[in-house]
């Protein structure tokens, strides 16, 4: 059974108003969306996903809860354009559950999982051209090294890149997994899950995940009402660092000389999963929920 990560903490801290407007930017299987929608009466939930299958698979479930939901098949980096098309200029809350969703991992043919053999793909939006096969088989040494260093945080990125280029063509996930393991030092393999990091790096590149996150963070503030929240769940240090620094910059820019926290325009809270949640849902182990509240 799919369990949404940090669901109780997210719902508790969103302070959901029954007549509010909320935006779920990463629908996935719809667990967070369903919890929000069930608390709305006259309010509205707008859900985004760049993966059309996510919308198809969640639509019936959400509409059974309430008809007050709008489905948008689009990259969340374009949220502002889509909201304004619908004459929505202020919302009560945004939520994001970043990274790859459980269905994308579970569907082996999508090529996201290094434990399932499939053609190298990793596209969240199946209509886009760039896929993992192109990255692995066509990027030059400098570009591929940069991807592995920046998005996989791999110290052996250059030697891995050379091994990949020397072994082309590489067509499947298992071919790539075997190559990574055979070309990495044993000591490094024992210390770090290099395969996981390589797959993460390629996935981030294919879907421009960090670029989309930065695009959202550059725009969302002007869409927040008074007493509203943005809640973002991250799963690795790269995306978490971006969110943390943005929230920190907002805190600094709105800082007052008063000691009363209610005088601050913004406040921030960070929540990690409990031991019991991690035991129930292993995916939550690396999760971190950051919540920014706009107080006025």
UniProtKB/Swiss-Prot annotation:
Amino-acid positions noted as binding S-adenosyl-L-methionine in the UniProt annotation, renumbered to this chain: 30-32, 49, 97, 104
GO CC, one annotated term: cytoplasm
EC number: 2.1.1.199
Keyword terms, alphabetized: Cytoplasm, Methyltransferase, rRNA processing, S-adenosyl-L-methionine, Transferase
InterPro entries linked to this entry: RsmH, SAM-dep_MeTrfase_MraW_recog, SAM-dependent_MTases_sf
Example of a GO MF term: rRNA (cytosine-N4-)-methyltransferase activity
Database matches in Pfam families: Methyltransf_5
Location within or outside the cell: Cytoplasm
SUPFAM superfamilies documented for this protein: Putative methyltransferase TM0872, insert domain, S-adenosyl-L-methionine-dependent methyltransferases
Cysteine pairings via disulfide bonds: none
Keyword Glycoprotein among UniProt keywords: no
Catalyzed reactions per annotation: cytidine(1402) in 16S rRNA + S-adenosyl-L-methionine = N(4)-methylcytidine(1402) in 16S rRNA + S-adenosyl-L-homocysteine + H(+)
GO terms for biological process, alphabetical: rRNA base methylation
Biological function: Specifically methylates the N4 position of cytidine in position 1402 (C1402) of 16S rRNA.
Record NCBIfam families: 16S rRNA (cytosine(1402)-N(4))-methyltransferase RsmH
Family according to the record: Belongs to the methyltransferase superfamily. RsmH family.
Protein's UniProt name: Ribosomal RNA small subunit methyltransferase H
Phylogenetic placement of the source organism: Bacteria, Bacillati, Mycoplasmatota, Mycoplasmoidales, Metamycoplasmataceae
């Amino acid at each position: 059974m799919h369990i949404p990560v940090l669901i109780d903490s997210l719902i508790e801290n969103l302070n959901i108003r029954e007549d509010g407007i909320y935006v779920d930017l990463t629908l996935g299987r719809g667990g967070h969306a369903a919890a929000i929608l069930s608390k709305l009466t006259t309010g509205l939930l707008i859900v985004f996903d760049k993966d059309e299958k996510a919308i198809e698979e969640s639509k019936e479930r959400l509409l059974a809860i309430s008809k007050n939901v709008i489905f948008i098949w689009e990259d969340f980096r374009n949220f502002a354009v889509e909201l304004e098309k619908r004459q929505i200029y202020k919302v009560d809350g945004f939520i994001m559950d970043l990274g790859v969703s459980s269905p994308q991992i579970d569907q082996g043919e999508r090529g996201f999982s290094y434990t399932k053999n499939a053609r190298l793909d990793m596209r969240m939006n199946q209509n886009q051209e760039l896929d993992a096969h192109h990255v692995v088989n066509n990027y030059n040494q400098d570009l591929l090294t940069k991807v592995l260093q920046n998005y996989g945080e791999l110290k052996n990125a250059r030697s891995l890149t050379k091994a990949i280029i020397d072994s082309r063509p590489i067509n499947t996930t298992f071919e790539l997994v075997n190559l990574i393991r055979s070309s990495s030092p044993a000591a490094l393999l024992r210390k770090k899950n290099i395969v996981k990091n390589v797959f993460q790096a390629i996935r981030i590149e294919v879907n421009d995940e960090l670029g989309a996150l930065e695009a959202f963070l550059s725009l969302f503030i002007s869409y927040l009402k008074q007493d509203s929240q943005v809640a973002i769940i991250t799963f690795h240090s790269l995306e978490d660092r971006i969110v943390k620094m943005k929230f920190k910059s907002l805190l600094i820019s709105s800082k007052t000389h008063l000691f009363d926290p209610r005088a601050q325009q913004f406040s921030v809270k960070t929540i990690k999963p409990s031991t019991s949640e991690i035991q129930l849902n292993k995916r939550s182990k690396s999760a971190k929920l950051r919540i920014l509240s706009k107080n006025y």
